Design a protein with these regions (language model features):
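Non-transmembrane, aqueous-exposed alpha-helical and coiled segments at domain scale
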Residues: 2-63, 68-272
Length: 272
């Protein structure tokens, strides 16, 4: 077995090596616009960011059929539920099967997190998600069409993960069969998944009375508290209007009523 090298093979011929060239067709399909809070205590950023297939792979760690199927499912849901609007990662709750692949897609695209109670688990979903917009309580479900993914590959995926004493596959067999299974997965992706559109085999429906599982843990998420705070009307910050604009000057704004208020501390006299 090879070991990772100290030199990162970041790209090959200008492309990320970790996304095979034959997945090029998936790139334009699996693009997601998302929006987030502007800072840890900030309001909602009005500009969006684009999440690509490469981003999902970097977050998850590798390309696999589960990652791609989850991304196809989420693309189908977004097209129906949000109708061109971005995924607002400050305002979504997601339910996913307890799968590394599906769960990572869910977390990255919706902002759902187990520790805040906004990523919850339901293994009965299979390859699919339930997504709730918290502010409106509108809820949608997306599921993969039954039989779309080959049952033989599913059987082998489960068998190759069985490390119990009674496992049907020996360690010597695994050395070969893991590679066979990977080849079958990729062949299915290339021949079937990439030849389809997300809405072809991933069905989305609105849920009027969704049963959302209990959270694993539920702490307060602080970076979305001020998402609806209005933009300042008096204080002119050097970091407005664009955080990514020119490099601003450093130091306080002299003579500013609001700089003075800040310097007095939270419990100091208020303005006006």
């Amino acid at each position: 077995m090879g070991s990772p090298t100290t030199e990162s093979e970041k790209s090959r011929d200008g492309e990320a090596w970790y996304v095979p060239a034959w997945l090029e067709a998936a790139r334009p399909v699996l693009e997601f616009d998302v929006c987030d809070a502007r800072s840890a205590q900030g309001r909602l950023e009005t500009r969006t960011k684009r999440v690509t297939l490469d981003d999902l792979v970097l977050f998850h760690g590798h390309v696999c059929d589960g990652l791609l199927r989850g991304a196809y499912a989420m693309r189908a849901l977004g097209d129906v539920a949000f109708e061109g609007r971005p995924f607002d990662r400050t305002d979504l709750l997601v339910v996913s099967k307890n799968s590394p692949c599906l769960g990572d897609v869910a977390a990255y695209l919706t902002g759902g997190r187990g520790r805040f109670g906004t990523l919850r688990l339901n293994n009965d979903l299979g390859v699919g998600y339930v997504v709730r917009e918290l502010s409106s309580e509108r809820t949608w479900e997306v599921r993969e069409e039954a039989g779309f993914f080959p049952s033989l590959i599913s059987q082998w995926e489960a068998a190759l993960l069985d490390d119990s004493p009674n496992a049907h596959v020996t360690s010597n067999e695994k050395a070969e069969l893991v590679a066979v299974n990977e080849a079958r997965q990729w062949s299915w992706v290339r021949e079937v998944l990439l030849a389809s559109r997300p809405g072809d085999h991933y069905t989305v429906r609105s849920l009027e009375a969704a049963e959302i599982p209990e959270p694993l843990y539920e702490a307060r998420r602080t970076d979305v508290v001020n998402r609806h705070v209005r933009a300042p009307s008096e204080y002119v910050t050097p970091y407005e209007p664009l955080l990514g604009g020119t490099t601003p000057r450093l130091g306080r704004v002299e003579g500013s009523t609001w700089e003075d208020r800040y310097d007095r501390g939270p419990t100091g006299p208020r303005v006006g």
